[in-house]
Amino acid sequence: MKFICLVYAEPDALSSLSPAEKSELDRDSLAYDQELEASGRFIAASALQGVKTARTVRVRAGKPLVTDGPFAETKEVLCGFIFIEAADADEALNIAQGIPMARHGTIEVRPELDFG
């Protein structure tokens, strides 16, 4: 089964990390991605630019409305994702627990919808 691990964190919490802590987090994250890839469970991953670069698009009555920023006002914002292959939800949750960003934020795990 395929699962997406959505990585959320508070921007202030991340910006308060020291350069050494940021470097360690980057190193740990890349190493974990490589570990998942070696085990055949990694599909894709990406970190996202800050929320200030976000644009929101809605189409109503056939007309697009584009606004700056995210749709909702929340403390934690989407920072990235890891798309994985797991045997079941329990394995996906175990994988999510190992994501280094889980130490600084929240990982939301959702199964892919199979239109099959």
Predicted regions and their residues:
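Conserved, structured core segments of small domains
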Residues: 1-116
